[in-house]
Curated annotation (Swiss-Prot):
Keyword list, A-Z: Ribonucleoprotein, Ribosomal protein, RNA-binding, rRNA-binding
NCBIfam families the record matches: L9
Family: Belongs to the bacterial ribosomal protein bL9 family.
Protein's name according to its UniProt entry: Large ribosomal subunit protein bL9
InterPro entries membership: Ribosomal_bL9, Ribosomal_bL9/RNase_H1_N, Ribosomal_bL9_bac/chp, Ribosomal_bL9_C, Ribosomal_bL9_C_sf, Ribosomal_bL9_N, Ribosomal_bL9_N_sf
Species assigned in the record: Hamiltonella defensa subsp. Acyrthosiphon pisum (strain 5AT)
Length: 150
């Protein structure tokens, strides 16, 4: 099934690309989320009319993502308090949701699906390196320090 991408899709293409995808991917993801339209003559003409509008919208989204990534990189570290045992292991763990909430509380809006924990959830006290994928091609990283609540 051929579709025209209305947004940049990782591993598929850029805005405006005409790509061939499997029917299920198009019907269940691309079309309902508004990330693509079927590649008909009518849709091709409609897309050509709206191309500049969509490109400016995409450029604006990239600029916003870069600004958020700069804000995360400029933040020296993020400290999170959690209950821990005497050996430095946490009761529970710190996950993507906890990190996103702490950053949002600090004034930098981050969604939990943008947080990348390379070694899984954080389960020990100390410093941990956390990576963020804000947008396709826009990355950031931050040092998260976990301290004991006691």
């Amino acid at each position: 099934m051929e579709v025209i991408l209305l947004d940049e899709i990782e591993n598929f293409g850029q805005l405006g690309d005409k790509v061939k995808v499997k029917r299920g991917f198009a019907r269940n993801f691309l079309l309902p989320k508004g990330k693509a339209v079927l590649a008909t003559k009518k849709n091709m003409a409609y897309f050509d009319e709206r191309r500049s509008e969509l490109e400016s919208k995409a450029a604006k989204a990239i600029e916003e993502a870069k600004a958020r990534a700069r804000a995360i990189n400029e933040l020296a570290s993020l400290t999170i308090a959690s209950k821990a045992g005497s050996e430095g292991r946490l009761f529970g763990s710190i996950g993507t949701r906890d990190i996103a909430k702490s950053l949002s509380d600090a004034g930098i809006p981050v969604m939990k699906n943008e947080v990348r924990l390379l070694n899984g959830f954080l389960r020990t006290l100390g410093e941990h390196e956390v990576h963020f994928k804000i947008y396709n091609g826009v990355f950031a990283q931050l040092k998260v320090i976990i301290i004991s609540e006691d």
